């Protein structure tokens, strides 16, 4: 019989690290991060004859007259196993109600529509799972690409497995190739920031959020991510190397001057070709 229950951190970690749908949102590090941000979190899941077959992080936060519950990036389970799904959500509903839950938001790590490079619809997938969620009371919040208050609803994923550098270059569109060539020309380099440089990262995200109209996190959040995830979290910046940029400009000027000299020499030798 499938049984919904709370889990230990060791049970969850062992299961999540080997699950094909595992992701950073469903890790002990994320649970600890959420708790530092004021959420209370539990590991919950479903066991079948003592064997764990589904798991996720269930978070809750106090609101005016109860608690708001949230699952982000889960549930780690086989969505084709109907008995498991039913056991999970039946148990989850009881758990949320027992713990004064006002509402539950759920962002599954599950595709609903595949799209091409330009955003055009290719194929709808997992419709049966989607229909099941709505049948038990969930309301879909739509596919707004501009405003979101949590996990983004649209993701761009590029499979680079087995690609050589040449293959990868050929896969880029014309605009992408142009932009990359410009970064080479300008001497743009990337590097990983140290913990003490996170205020610089915060300054960049703050300016970008104001320009692009999205809500930024505070510095304490980025510091907590760095502390909890350690080497698994990468804070990267792109920087313009002015010395390299100037050198490239001088080289471009030199080549242009060579071309100009060749043209002038040709005109002197053949004045009537003007």
What are these regions (language model features)?
Residues 4-65, 116, 136-149, 155, ...:
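A conserved beta-strand-loop-helix scaffold within acyl/acetyltransferase catalytic domains
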Residues 66-148, 256-258, 263, 268-274:
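Acyl-donor binding region in acyl/amide transferases
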